Structure formats: C-alpha cells, structure tokens
C-alpha cells in the first residue's frame, strides 16, 4: 500500500479516533508531510520503538504502540509467560502515561497480567520491578536523550535488562507480523 492510500485509510477508517483524523486533515495540502508520516511503519528495533509523536504509521501514537504491544504479547504467549505479567513504567514525556495505558490494555486483552506504575518512574526502577515481581517482561515509555517531540517504547526481559539477541529479533518478527490487535477499552 502506498503512502497516500495509508493516509486516506487513517483519515477515513472507523478504528481511528477523531483527534487523529483532525490532525491528519490539517496536513492534507502538505504532501511531503503526508509522505514522511506514512511512507513506512515506525520500526521496532533492537530496544523497541522511538519516533516523533503524531498521527501516522511512521510516528509514535496509540496505534503504533498498540501494534508493538500486540507483537510483544504474541511473543509472551508463545513463551507461556502470561501469568508472570509485564511491568510498565513511563517518564515525563508528552503522551507517556497514555502510551503506558495503551500497552496495558492491549496486554490485558491478551490475558497477560500487568503492573503499571501510577506516576513517572526512572528506567532502573522498572528493571528492578521486573526482577522483584518475577515478571516475564517490562516496558518503559521513554525517548531517553531524544528531542522533546519524540517518545519511545523500550522492552526489558525477565532478567531486568533490555532485550538482546536472539529475543530482540524474535520479538521484532512478531511485531512485523501483526495484522490485528486485541484491545480492552476502559
């Protein structure tokens, strides 16, 4: 699917909220902006996702976060780790609490227990919590050192460390293979 088709799908699709559609309609005359937002999917790399916050497949938003979380959920289910749960932390960046909630709702819809912090926490506290609670994984919503318009999504495994080979590649494969997501509404 070409970037203009993806743009139209996001502008008209029933699954996309009005706020997302309004943001995209605001750029309808700016083809270079549309192309930048839709020419590819935001890549789930070795440590997770990182990108500019906004509407589009190449941006950090609730839809790309949910897709990444669905891939992680699929991997956890294959490992039979749903009962161990996933700890979720977030920093002070824009949309961090919302993205952490999106991740929890997706994991819960897949039958995976979650432990989500009520307020912002540093990454080392997430790492400690994963080990202390015996979780199979952890997620931190943070863009670390990137500019303020960015946010990110980092995955940690049951040892409290960021995912490394071969798990990173296996999770990336699951994320890239997502065609549908499970989601629980509040």
Q: What kind of region is each of these model predictions?
A:
Residues 52-53, 149-150, 164-166:
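Short helix/loop capping segments that flank catalytic or ligand/cofactor-binding pockets
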Residues 184-185:
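Conserved small/polar residues in nucleotide/adenosyl-binding loops
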